[in-house]
């Protein structure tokens, strides 16, 4: 998607449709006047409430005028960035449905909107650009088109150009913000592509290749450990999960170093289980196809590092991705096995479907021992219990640092990728005690997301600034959340906003 930012008014530019952002206040006073000035019928406003994300189409009466179509997008009271995000996302989604090639956004009110929002014009522009990218997303790379009898090659498959029109004196700020938003949006969509790929199209080695490609785009160093190196490092958690697989595991390190001295060094760890059958503790057949999404944490980390690099943020960001699939076979790990992780801590495997924490344990150990970063954050589709607790729209947050937890919460609010903190009290550690090993990998039916976090806490080696984000719900929601089925790329915006907060 190409970006154009112009001072020209939206009513006079070349575009297939012009998006007009309308608030509930504007609906009463200004919307009719605006439509008349553009030569469109006010009748389109009849049933329009201007709620956030609501759309209605109007048409200009004079033929030959460009843009002919006016897409009114509701922004509610216009006092929250999230309302603008919903509006731009909905408009882009509609544009793709209508096969609109050039979509323009009327930004003539940007200065006033920013004032109402108590933000800068570039921040608003970043939200609009990122949301348009998000709404325009379609995952169709695996469709051959051979059965599509109505296919029209003359019409655009998606939005080819996004135009910010009527920018006036805000042109420079809007251009800077829109460019940043396009970067974050493209990275989030790249994460969605990875998560949407089925297991037969994405192995651990393929995921490592995706990290290499991100490194080329972002200009950062990528190192991939093969099974031999993983074995030398004694990453017993990753190797145990991989025992049932015919595909080798990988351990990928992405290292973005800013120019000059970094303000902080941030380690991001992402769970990369490319398909999770549950192993010997086999999952139910219903819904198992969605377990291609069990590497959503890894996809998020890969693309957050890329976004940080392309935005040239002044923090060092190191991503770690342990990756394998989790399959049943004659060689797979079995319930009751005791394994030794890289840290030397032994784990009783009560359930082979609690595998994500095993590979994360080794990754956290490696990150702490080899880099000792200022902050460690892991993201994982870790527990169904987190969905039971919080539903699909919100991620679970666990941290041993209240200041870090607060920063993540605020970034969640700002980015629209919300997190909610759950406790890490010592009482929960009692639930993962083992009679035969140092720790058990499950804690029973109750408090499953908390006991998983307590398990991970044992592998941070006393690090004082660690957070765990359980994205099981919002990464691939089956209810609520994204209006587009499949992967959401949840966590990319959250992490980018967090990294920017240290800038």
From Swiss-Prot:
The main place the protein resides is cytoplasm
Which residues are noted in the entry as Mn(2+) 1-binding?
276, 353, 355
Answer whether the UniProt record assigns the keyword Repressor to this protein: no
Cofactor or coenzyme needed: Mn(2+)
> Under the cellular component aspect of Gene Ontology, which terms does the record hold?
cytoplasm
Record GO terms (molecular function): manganese ion binding; metalloaminopeptidase activity
Q: What is its EC number?
A: 3.4.11.1, 3.4.11.10
**Reaction(s) this enzyme catalyzes, per UniProt:** Release of an N-terminal amino acid, Xaa-|-Yaa-, in which Xaa is preferably Leu, but may be other amino acids including Pro although not Arg or Lys, and Yaa may be Pro. Amino acid amides and methyl esters are also readily hydrolyzed, but rates on arylamides are exceedingly low; Release of an N-terminal amino acid, preferentially leucine, but not glutamic or aspartic acids
Q: Indicate the residues that form the catalytic site.
A: 283, 357
Give GO terms for biological process.
proteolysis
Residues binding Mn(2+) 2: 271, 276, 294, 355
Cofactor, free-text remark: Binds 2 manganese ions per subunit.
Give each disulfide bond as a residue pair. Answer: none
**Domain of life of the source:** Bacteria
Which UniProt keyword terms apply here? Aminopeptidase, Cytoplasm, Hydrolase, Manganese, Metal-binding, Protease
Q: Please state where this protein is localized.
A: Cytoplasm
Q: Which family does it belong to?
A: Belongs to the peptidase M17 family.
Role noted for this protein: Presumably involved in the processing and regular turnover of intracellular proteins. Catalyzes the removal of unsubstituted N-terminal amino acids from various peptides.
- PANTHER family with a match to the protein in the record: CYTOSOL AMINOPEPTIDASE, LEUCINE AMINOPEPTIDASE-RELATED
Q: What is this protein called?
A: Probable cytosol aminopeptidase
| Organism encoding this protein | Chlorobaculum parvum (strain DSM 263 / NCIMB 8327) (Chlorobium vibrioforme subsp. thiosulfatophilum)
């Amino acid at each position: 998607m190409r970006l154009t930012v112009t001072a020209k008014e939206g009513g006079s530019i070349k575009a297939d449709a012009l998006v007009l952002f309308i608030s509930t206040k504007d609906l009463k006073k200004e919307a009719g006047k605006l439509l008349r000035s553009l030569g469109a019928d006010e009748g389109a406003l009849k049933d329009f409430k201007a709620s956030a994300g609501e759309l209605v189409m109007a048409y200009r009466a004079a033929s030959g005028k460009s843009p002919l179509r006016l897409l009114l997008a509701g922004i509610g009271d216009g006092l929250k960035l999230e309302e603008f995000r919903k509006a731009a996302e909905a408009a882009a989604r509609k544009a793709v449905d209508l096969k609109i090639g050039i979509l323009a956004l009327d930004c003539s009110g940007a200065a006033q909107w920013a004032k109402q929002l108590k933000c800068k014009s570039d921040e608003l522009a970043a939200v609009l650009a990122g949301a348009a990218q998000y709404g325009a997303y379609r995952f169709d790379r695996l469709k051959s088109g051979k059965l599509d009898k109505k296919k029209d090659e003359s019409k655009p498959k998606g939005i080819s150009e996004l135009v910010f029109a009527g920018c006036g004196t805000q042109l420079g700020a809007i251009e800077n913000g829109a460019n940043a938003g396009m970067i974050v949006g493209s990275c989030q969509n790249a994460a969605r592509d990875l998560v949407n790929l089925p297991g037969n199209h994405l192995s651990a080695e393929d995921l490592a290749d995706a990290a290499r490609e991100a490194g080329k785009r972002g200009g950062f160093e990528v190192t991939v450990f093969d099974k031999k190196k993983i074995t030398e490092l004694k990453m017993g958690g990753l190797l145990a999960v991989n025992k049932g697989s015919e595909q080798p595991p990988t351990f990928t390190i992405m290292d973005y170093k800013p120019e000059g001295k970094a303000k902080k060094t941030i380690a991001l760890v992402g769970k990369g289980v490319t398909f999770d059958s549950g192993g010997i503790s086999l999952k139910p057949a219903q819904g198992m196809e969605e377990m291609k999404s069990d590497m959503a944490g890894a996809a998020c980390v890969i693309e957050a590092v890329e976004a940080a690099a392309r935005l040239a943020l002044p923090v060092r960001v190191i991503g770690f991705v342990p990756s394998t699939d989790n399959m049943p076979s004659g060689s797979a790990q079995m319930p009751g096995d005791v394994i030794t992780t890289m840290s030397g801590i032994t784990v009783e495997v009560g359930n082979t479907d609690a595998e994500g924490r095993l590979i994360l344990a080794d990754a956290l150990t490696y990150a702490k021992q080899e880099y000792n970063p200022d902050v460690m954050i892991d993201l994982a589709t870790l527990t169904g219990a987190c969905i039971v607790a919080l539903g699909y729209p919100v991620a679970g947050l666990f941290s041993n640092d209240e200041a870090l937890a607060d920063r993540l919460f605020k970034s969640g609010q700002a980015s629209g990728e919300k997190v909610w903190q759950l406790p890490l009290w010592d009482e929960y550690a009692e639930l993962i005690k083992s009679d035969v090993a140092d720790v058990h990998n499950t804690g029973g039916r109750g408090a499953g997301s908390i006991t998983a976090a307590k398990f991970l806490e044992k592998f941070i080696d006393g690090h004082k600034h660690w957070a765990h984000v359980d994205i099981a719900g919002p990464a691939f929601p089956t209810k609520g959340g994204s209006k587009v089925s499949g992967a959401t790329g949840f966590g990319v915006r959250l992490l980018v906003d967090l990294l920017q907060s240290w800038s």
